[in-house]
From Swiss-Prot:
Tissue: Expressed in skeletal muscle (at protein level).
Protein source organism: Scylla paramamosain (Mud crab)
Catalytic reaction equation(s): D-glyceraldehyde 3-phosphate = dihydroxyacetone phosphate; dihydroxyacetone phosphate = methylglyoxal + phosphate
Active-site positions on this chain: 95, 165
Metabolic or biological pathway: Carbohydrate biosynthesis; gluconeogenesis; Carbohydrate degradation; glycolysis; D-glyceraldehyde 3-phosphate from glycerone phosphate: step 1/1
CDD domains: TIM (cd00311)
Pfam families hit by this protein: TIM
Subunit architecture: Homodimer.
Residues binding substrate: 12, 14
EC number of the protein: 5.3.1.1, 4.2.3.3
UniProt key word Nucleotidyltransferase: no
GO BP annotations, alphabetical order: gluconeogenesis; glyceraldehyde-3-phosphate biosynthetic process; glycerol catabolic process; glycolytic process; methylglyoxal biosynthetic process
Protein name, entry field: Triosephosphate isomerase
Main location: cytoplasm
Length: 248
């Protein structure tokens, strides 16, 4: 079944980079990339247009956040319409740093996802559990609740890529083993089968994030339900090409 879902690798630059750094990233992104892998990079808002104008056309560009309405008195926010006006077609929503540093709750994230889809963007909603939640055997409870909040606002699953990112593995150097990651991905796919539809379960890509590196990407990519990666720090380095080519 996995080979019916196109492998997907997203890079999340977070609050990193300037034009000189972006130029460096663009130079190594011109290297040989597996044509069977869809690639998207998420850059800071102020560099959306610059990145889109200079990045090779076969690589998508994502914003790292947006708000749930088209315009208005929401200082510091950007709308999906603005992202599209910059020539970009993707947005990352609900990243653990948005949830845990900025206090965004499940319902707000769901509303953002819904509006972004209505506005014509493709969306990467992020879910994942904290270390204490995993250690208390609450992983399924947490990620299923996050999924349950998302579902009512998802109007078009073909434009959604779910990113499972265990919070305890983001930027810590700790990585879920391929077995741990595959286990959660398989359970998420079964949840979609039971709560949305078998078709959505089989067609929706579920990608893994959390200290993905050139050293561990190939083992993770061999599993049946991991359809790609959302990569943080490594997406700023030439190693990102190795990760993109994990299934090559």
């Amino acid at each position: 079944m996995a080979n019916q879902r196109k492998f997907f690798v997203g890079g999340n630059w977070k609050m990193n980079g300037d034009k000189a750094a972006i130029d460096g990233i663009i130079s190594f992104m011109k290297g040989p990339l597996n044509a069977d892998t869809e690639v998207v990079v998420g850059c800071p808002q102020c560099y959306l247009m610059y990145t889109r104008e200079h990045m090779p056309a076969n690589i998508g560009v994502a914003a790292q956040n947006c708000y749930k309405t088209a315009k208005g008195a929401f200082t510091g926010e950007i709308s999906p319409a603005m992202i599209k006006d910059c020539g970009c077609e993707w947005v990352i929503l609900g990243h653990s740093e948005r949830r845990n540093v900025f206090g965004e709750p499940d319902q707000l994230i769901s509303e953002k996802v819904g509006h972004a889809l209505e506005a014509g963007l493709k969306v990467i909603p992020c879910i994942g559990e904290k270390l204490e939640e995993r250690e208390s055997n609450r992983t399924e409870e947490v990620v299923f609740a996050q999924m349950k909040a998302l579902v009512p606002n998802i109007s078009d699953w073909s434009r959604v890529v779910i990113a499972y990112e265990p919070v305890w593995a983001i930027g810590t150097g700790k990585t879920a083993t391929p077995e741990q990651a595959q286990d959660v991905h398989a359970k998420l796919r079964q949840w979609l089968r039971d709560n949305v539809s078998p078709q959505v379960a089989e067609s929706t890509r579920i990608i893994y994030g959390g200290s993905v590196s050139a050293g561990n990407c190939k083992e993770l990519a061999k599993t049946g339900d991991i359809d790609g990666f959302l990569v943080g720090g490594a997406s700023l380095k030439p190693d990102f090409v190795t990760i993109i080519n994990a299934r090559a």
